[in-house]
UniProtKB/Swiss-Prot annotation:
Residues 9-92 form the HTH TFE/IIEalpha-type domain. The gene is tfe. One of its GO terms (biological process) is transcription initiation at RNA polymerase II promoter. This is Transcription factor E. Monomer. Interaction with RNA polymerase subunits RpoF and RpoE is necessary for Tfe stimulatory transcription activity. Able to interact with Tbp and RNA polymerase in the absence of DNA promoter. Interacts both with the preinitiation and elongation complexes. Keywords: DNA-binding, Transcription, Transcription regulation. It comes from the Archaea. Signal peptide: none annotated.
Length: 173
């Protein structure tokens, strides 16, 4: 099991986590004690990070299976306490899951871009499909300029390359 600092030293993992939880979340991971489970209040005190930021970070990490909690009930008050610990060993599963979601979106976009012809307004930049351009008689509905054909081959090729790269990283090839 890698330490929190070793995991954060990986630039790709750091960028992934930073996008997910921001600066304070990264600091929480850096300062998160590994000796036992901690309540969110204890973590805020130990790490000197705002309690709301600690909670938001923990919930986000939990959603990605990068943190887990154990719930205990105080029999006298009936209050529940959540004891948290990090599960950063699940990092690569989390990244893979998110990449699968991105891959599906890119595939849909690729299909849309490759199956349609587009027209663009040189004045305002509005872009529409051939079908919509025909319906509007190739006149921009925003500024009433004439629409011109827009060659999206560059975008289609870029999407194709990105999809291939992600598929290769995920072992789909």
């Amino acid at each position: 099991m890698a330490s929190h600092e070793e995991i954060l030293a990986d630039k790709a993992i750091f960028a992934y986590l930073h996008r997910m939880i921001g600066d304070e979340g990264i600091e929480l991971i850096r300062r998160f004690p590994t000796d036992k489970e901690y309540s969110d209040e204890e973590l805020a005190e130990v790490t000197k990070i705002n309690l709301n930021s600690v909670r938001n970070t923990l919930y986000t990490l939990y959603e990605h299976r990068l943190a887990k909690y154990r719930r205990i009930k105080n029999n006298e008050t009936g209050w529940l306490t959540y004891l948290w610990e990090l599960e950063l060993d699940n990092m690569y599963d989390s990244v893979s899951k998110d990449l699968e979601i991105i891959l599906e979106k890119l595939r849909k976009r690729y299909k849309y871009e490759s199956e349609n012809a587009f027209y663009n307004c040189p004045n305002c930049g509005n872009t529409i499909t051939f079908s919509d351009a025909m319906d509007s008689q190739f006149v921009c509905q925003e500024c009433e300029n004439k629409m011109v054909h827009f060659d999206n081959d560059l975008l289609v090729n870029a999407l194709q390359k990105r999809i291939a790269r992600i598929e290769e990283n995920l072992g789909h090839v």
